[in-house]
């Protein structure tokens, strides 16, 4: 379950027009949400409050062998943020839970419109966040600054009495088709560069679908530790598309780390509006070791309720998990305009020209009908996800190499966001040192950790 402060940060990004899915850091977010979801450990209780439209506070208390607590405060000068931040009673479960990330292709009209409108509508905004942990007296701070529509500066700092303080700076530039990121950290003098390039969607000869709703992205990262002179790098390919017959989205990724010889491929598909399946295969070229992981989530619907009308975006805007396309529903209800031919603006010519236009319309009529059908099928499936009021979700993942099973339940009850789960492992039991050499304890399926987390916000 997403913490309240993380929800405010994502709402800030959405309000300022920043797309977190167009970053190399989140290029494999879908498979990670389904396979490597976080299972709570111990008992954690979190209470949050929006005291003013620009200030937010959170108090957290946890009990994992010892009692810990934290107090967080967030301030932002972003205008209109209250339209995106929801309390625990009103927030949709698919927005509060980490799940499948829907990626829409970015066409040239999007970047042109964002650049022209951004100069008129965009206003610089900033976000300040701080959290103090007790009893360790560890301080966590973050500053996010949006100076222009395409740039973002992020500074993160952790100060602790027991360990050395760490300061990390991020400078990000997102032009739509390319997203570049420069990173500098005081931890080992780490310097990094990330880039993600989106290939503009176009009709492929190998693609039999007329309505091309696919997205192909290729990115990489370079890291270098100045103090220990250690390099690191990786590259990833991501392909997102929809089934033309059912409208169901799927995502494929292929990652490669040439220094360590690690190759990873993932396949994630939303089989229905209430079920998602993901698989991952890892292979090392040097050690010849491999691993196969599976994960899924199953959603249960609750009572139907009317969505908040303020969460609407234009039809031709890039899609995110929380986007709502009100104009799509209006056009879908109205239906296509059958009386308007394809080249109606050229019908005022001669008789021979009109005959030629009529022949063209007859020739391409079947193709146009197929395009409209495929587009409406995809949009109908997306609208079913946006309009759904889910009450709970079950998440499961397993790994053949590690022989573990993760189980997580997330839901809403009486205004509370509840997350409860356990991780079962097949590792052998640890024996005392005086009995370690006598016999081997057989591996048993036992809970490695379990816990529950409750969140309440107003």
Swiss-Prot record:
Transmembrane segments: none
Chain spans, region Disordered: 307-339
Subcellular location(s) per record: Mitochondrion outer membrane
Domain of life: Eukaryota
Keyword Cell inner membrane assigned: no
Keyword Mitochondrion appears in the UniProt entry: yes
Keywords, alphabetical: Membrane, Mitochondrion, Mitochondrion outer membrane, Transmembrane, Transmembrane beta strand
Assembly mode: Component of the ER-mitochondria encounter structure (ERMES) or MDM complex, composed of MMM1, MDM10, MDM12 and MDM34. Associates with the mitochondrial outer membrane sorting assembly machinery SAM(core) complex.
Protein family (similarity comment): Belongs to the MDM10 family.
Protein name, per record: Mitochondrial distribution and morphology protein 10
Source organism (scientific name): Lachancea thermotolerans (strain ATCC 56472 / CBS 6340 / NRRL Y-8284)
